[in-house]
From Swiss-Prot:
Disulfide bonds, paired cysteine numbers: 41-52, 69-159, 103-134, 123-145, 135-151
Function description: Antifreeze proteins lower the blood freezing point.
Domain annotation C-type lectin: ranges: 39-163
Gene Ontology cellular-component annotations: extracellular region
Name assigned to this protein: Type-2 ice-structuring protein
Cross-referenced SUPFAM superfamilies: C-type lectin-like
Keywords annotated in UniProt: Antifreeze protein, Disulfide bond, Lectin, Secreted, Signal
Length: 163
């Protein structure tokens, strides 16, 4: 009985110590994803949630832009929320390639990084859904909506990598 009482007292003391750390903000237990520190992005990249974003100023085709992003450790940017869309808008001084494409099947838009396309910001009459225009760009229009363009066009691009 004495042993059980000692164990209970020890557990209460440890629980109290951990509660004190939480109240003081010194607890080391991992918190939810939204409370994680931003990733340490490579030079030239900017943190956005659990990802790093890079604005590539050299104009190139969609395929070369994707290859370039992969060489840098990422993909052309996928966009999953209005927050991400707005952030990328702040980087964009004109038309840029982002990671959407429908080149395998007209109208079947996917992100090059394989993530689900759960957010959309198409321009009002887009996409055209023709294979000749199967790569996605963010326009230079006021709302910087998405448009489908022929992939051989040369534009700047936005890369993203996840940590």
């Amino acid at each position: 009985m004495l042993t059980v009482s000692l164990l209970v007292c020890a557990m209460m003391a440890l629980t109290q110590a951990n509660d004190d750390k939480i109240l003081k903000g010194t607890a080391t237990e991992a918190g939810p994803v939204s409370q994680r520190a931003p990733p340490n992005c490579p030079a030239g990249w900017q943190p956005l949630g659990d990802r790093c974003i890079y604005y590539e100023t050299t104009a190139m085709t969609w395929a070369l832009a994707e290859t370039n992003c992969m060489k840098l450790g990422g993909h052309l940017a996928s966009i999953h929320s209005q927050e991400e869309h707005s952030f990328i808008q702040t980087l964009n001084a004109g038309v840029v390639w982002i990671g959407g494409s429908a080149c395998l099947q007209a109208g079947a838009w996917t992100w090059s990084d394989g993530t689900p396309m759960n957010f959309r910001s198409w321009c009002s009459t887009k996409p055209d859904d023709v294979l000749a225009a199967c790569c996605m760009q963010m326009t230079a229009a006021a709302d910087q909506c998405w448009d489908d363009l022929p992939c051989p066009a040369s534009h700047k691009s936005v890369c993203a990598m996840t940590f």
